[in-house]
């Protein structure tokens, strides 16, 4: 029987406090996370940002137990998906490829080759495609595949995005309805979708379909929820987790929470729409930071919907995605990672000197100024970073 490998791609996260700095360095070294007009500045800037943010990030991870649970949860998802697919008669082994922390993609590739896998299905654990999530993972996989003749011989099928898949929608509805049922007046509960944000330029300049897919997904869930409950609920979509001075997708989660408080919303059902497992953005950012903002704004009941994790309906939905990929037309790695032809993948390639409104140009200028300041301080041995104890 053909040996099938299912490669689950995810972000990764630091498992111990000492991992936080290196994890952040890997994250910000990715040009899809911070895109600069001068590639040579990428790693120095990544080092600087990871150094400056490390202490704050460590405190955030300490507040949720000292590390990210994303690897443990992804491994659980992989085991249950493997079991489900084997129950369906498929000779499947699941593998995990994390983008920014262990186990890295290289490790998964080595394991698949050692196991003699005959065909690979690549399934990103991101329902919605974005340059900075699935896109980055697909391009990393493509780079490694192109440099490995043996790996390149193994047939590969990719699932690009799956936010409209019935099992995913059903599992979201089931988890949301659990929280709505706790409300004194379920029909009056306000559904609050919060998705991980991306810089606005990714959508407007690079053609990232993420915003459109998030909006479509929110509406699909609301429609399915109404059928399931027999009544409609008002809803709002916002974006969280922005970093840096550039403009990200709006509205921002913290601002919307304040507005909902002013609107006298009592029962708020918070739905982390772009996260399929618990990690720092759900356990710390939503459960601690945003809950505090909501309570200060006057929201009485802040009910956060659990992440999908290993919810049975969700695992069933993932297995259906794999089966559909195997039985449907081949989507290769080139097709999975491409963007619309009318746009360029890296808008910063258009960068020119001169003042304009492009946030990515501002990113580049800021990076160059910061790098120059850092270089001078390293040479001189004195400056603000030394006074702060960072250098």
UniProtKB/Swiss-Prot annotation:
Query: Does the record's keyword annotation contain Metal-binding?
Result: yes
Give TM segment ranges: none
Quote the subcellular location field of this record.
Answer: Cytoplasm
Task: Give a yes or no for keyword NADP in this entry.
Answer: no
Q: In which pathway does it act?
A: Porphyrin-containing compound metabolism; protoheme biosynthesis; protoheme from protoporphyrin-IX: step 1/1
Q: What is its main location?
A: cytoplasm
Question: Which Pfam families does the protein's record reference?
Answer: Ferrochelatase
As recorded in UniProt, its EC number(s) are 4.98.1.1
The UniProt annotation places Fe cation binding at: 196, 281
Keyword annotations from UniProtKB, A to Z = Cytoplasm, Heme biosynthesis, Iron, Lyase, Metal-binding, Porphyrin biosynthesis
Give the InterPro entries listed for this entry. Ferrochelatase, Ferrochelatase_AS, Ferrochelatase_C, Ferrochelatase_N
Biological process annotations from GO: heme biosynthetic process
- A GO CC term attached to the entry: cytoplasm
The reaction(s) annotated as catalysed by this protein in its Swiss-Prot or TrEMBL entry are: heme b + 2 H(+) = protoporphyrin IX + Fe(2+)
What is the enzyme's class at the highest EC level? lyase
| Gene Ontology molecular function: any one | ferrochelatase activity
Which HAMAP family does the entry link to? Ferrochelatase
Physiological role: Catalyzes the ferrous insertion into protoporphyrin IX.
Concerning its family, UniProt says:
Belongs to the ferrochelatase family.
Give the protein's recorded name: Ferrochelatase
Species, as recorded: Prochlorococcus marinus (strain MIT 9515)
């Amino acid at each position: 029987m053909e040996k099938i490998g299912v490669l689950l791609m995810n972000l990764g996260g630091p498992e111990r406090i000492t991992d936080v700095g290196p994890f952040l360095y890997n994250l910000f070294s990715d040009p899809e996370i911070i895109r600069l007009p001068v590639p040579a500045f990428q790693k120095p800037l990544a080092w600087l940002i990871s150094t400056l943010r490390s202490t704050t990030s460590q405190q955030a991870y300490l507040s949720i137990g000292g590390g990210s649970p994303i690897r443990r949860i992804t491994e659980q998802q992989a085991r249950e998906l493997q079991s489900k697919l084997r129950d369906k008669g498929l000779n499947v082994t699941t593998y995990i490829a994390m983008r920014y922390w262990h186990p890295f993609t290289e490790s998964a590739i080595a394991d698949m080759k050692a196991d003699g896998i005959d065909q690979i299905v690549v399934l990103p654990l991101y329902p919605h495609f974005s340059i900075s999530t699935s896109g980055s993972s697909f391009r990393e996989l493509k780079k490694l595949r192109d440099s490995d003749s043996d790996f390149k011989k193994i047939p590969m099928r990719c699932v690009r995005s799956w936010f409209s898949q019935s099992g995913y929608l059903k599992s979201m509805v089931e988890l949301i309805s659990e929280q709505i049922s706790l409300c004194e007046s379920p029909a009056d509960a306000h559904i609050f979708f919060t998705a991980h944000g991306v810089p606005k330029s990714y959508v407007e300049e690079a053609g990232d379909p993420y915003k459109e897919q998030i909006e479509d997904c929110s509406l699909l869930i609301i429609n399915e929820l109404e059928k399931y409950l027999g009544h409609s609920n008002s809803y709002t979509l916002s974006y969280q987790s922005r970093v840096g001075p550039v403009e990200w997708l709006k509205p921002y989660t913290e601002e919307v929470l304040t507005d909902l408080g002013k609107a006298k919303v009592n029962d708020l059902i918070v739905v982390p729409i772009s996260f399929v497992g618990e990690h720092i953005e759900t356990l710390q950012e939503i459960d601690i930071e945003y809950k505090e903002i909501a309570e200060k704004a006057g929201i009485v009941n802040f009910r956060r919907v659990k992440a999908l994790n290993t919810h049975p309906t969700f695992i069933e939905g993932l297995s259906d995605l794999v089966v559909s990929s195997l039985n449907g037309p081949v989507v290769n790695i080139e097709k999975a990672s491409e963007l619309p032809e009318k746009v360029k993948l890296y808008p910063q390639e258009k960068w020119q000197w001169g003042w304009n409104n492009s946030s990515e140009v501002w990113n580049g200028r800021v990076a160059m100024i910061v790098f120059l300041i850092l270089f001078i301080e390293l040479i001189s041995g004195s400056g603000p970073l030394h006074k702060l104890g960072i250098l």
